[in-house]
From Swiss-Prot:
PANTHER family: ALLANTOINASE
Cofactor note: Binds 2 Zn(2+) ions per subunit.
Name of encoding gene: pyrC
GO cellular component: cytoplasm
This protein's UniProt keywords: Hydrolase, Metal-binding, Pyrimidine biosynthesis, Zinc
Lineage: Bacteria, Bacillati, Bacillota, Clostridia, Eubacteriales
Protein name: Dihydroorotase
Amino acid sequence: MIIIKNGYVIDPLTKREGKFDILIDGENVVRISQDIGIDDDIEVIDAEDCIVSPGFIDIHSHFRDPGFTEKEDIITGARAAARGGYTTVICMANTNPVVDNVETLRYIVDKAKTAKIEVLQVGTITKGMQGVELVDMEALKEAGAVGFSDDGKPIMDSRLVLEAMQKARELDVPLSFHEEDPKLVYESGINGGKVAEKLNMMGALEEAETVLTARDAALAVSSGAKTNIQHISSKISLGIIKLAKEMGANIIAEATPQHFSITEEEILNCGTNAKVNPPLRREDDRKAIVAALKDDTIQVIATDHAPHTKDEKAREFKEAPSGMIGLETALSLAVTNLVKTGDLTYRDMISKLTINPARFYNLDRGYIKEGHRADIVIFDPDEKYTVKEEEFQSKASNSPFIGKELFGKVKTTIYNGKIVYEDK
C-alpha cells in the first residue's frame, strides 16, 4: 500500500481541491480523506508543498517504434513520459511501416504491455499515409486503435476527409489532422516571416495552416465527427476554430508547449532544435494561443514529442528533420509560461493535461476517485530548475529548452498504483 500525505490535491473532474491524503491499495485509490492514519507496512510519500494531480495524458507523441528506434522506442518513450508526469500517451502512426494494418498495430500493442506507463496507438486515416484510400477503420479499432491520424502529412483530398469523418462518427472515434498545405510551404519548419528572410528562406506561410483548418472545420460542422486540429500555431486558425465551435462542430484544438512558449526568433538561438512543423510563429500568434488556452478555444495541451538523433539535427537547416522532444518539459513550460504569468489557474492547466484529452479519446482516465485506477503525478510548482541534456530519459535531446530555467518539477509519477518515476 502507498499513502500520499500532505499534498494539495487538484482534480478538475470531481472538483476536489485542497489538502487531502490519498491511500492506494494495489492498482486503485481506496481512500481520499484529510489525515489518514499510517500503518507500519504502508509506503509514505510526503507531498508537502506539492500539487497532487491525475496523471497527465498526451494525445500526440511519436515513439518511432517500429522503424526508427535509433531515435526512440516504446520503452524509452514511456520512461521519458513517466519523468514528465504522464501516465497515458497516445502515439502517432507515422512509423515504418505506418500503422495502417492490424499486424503493425498488434506489434505496438504487445510491446506497449511492457512499458512503464500506458501507451496507446492511433491508426492512419489513409493507406500508407498517401491520402488516396481510407484504411479499414473498423478492423483497426477492433485491434486497439483509439483514433486515427495521418499526422506528419496533410490530406489534400477533401472528399476523402469527409468520408473519413463520416466513418469516424459512425464508429465514435476521433480524428486528428496535421494542417499544412504543401503548396504554401516553401521550406518547412520555419515561419514565412522576418526570421526566414534573415536566413534567405521563404518558409512555411501561415496560410498553409489556415486554409486546411478552415476546410476541416467546415467538414467537422457538417459531419459531426470528433475532430482535433493538431499543434495549432496561427492566430487566424484560432478564429476559425472558435467559429466552428459556435456553429456546433465537435472540434478541439491542441496547443504544444513550444507554440505557447517561444517564437520564430528561437531559430536564431537554437537552430534546428527549434525547427518544428508547423513552425514557431510570431509573438502575436503565441499570445493568441495563450489567450485561446485561457478562454478554452484550445482545450488540450499536447506535446508533439518528436525525437531525432544528434546527427540528423546537425544537418543544414533545410535538410534537418522537424520536431523536438517535449514530454519531459511540458509541465514545466505550462507552469512557467501559463500559470506563473497569471493566464491559467493550476486547475485550468491540469484540465488541459488530464480530463479534457481523456474525454476527447473516450478514455476512462484523467481523475482521482476512490475505487478507480491510481494514475497520479506529484509535482512541486515552485521548484525552479535548469533543463539539462544529461537528465533526459528519452533517447533524444533535440530540445531548444536545454539550459533554460523553469518552474514546476515532477517529484513522483504513479501509474496503475505503482511508482514509475521518482525525482532523486
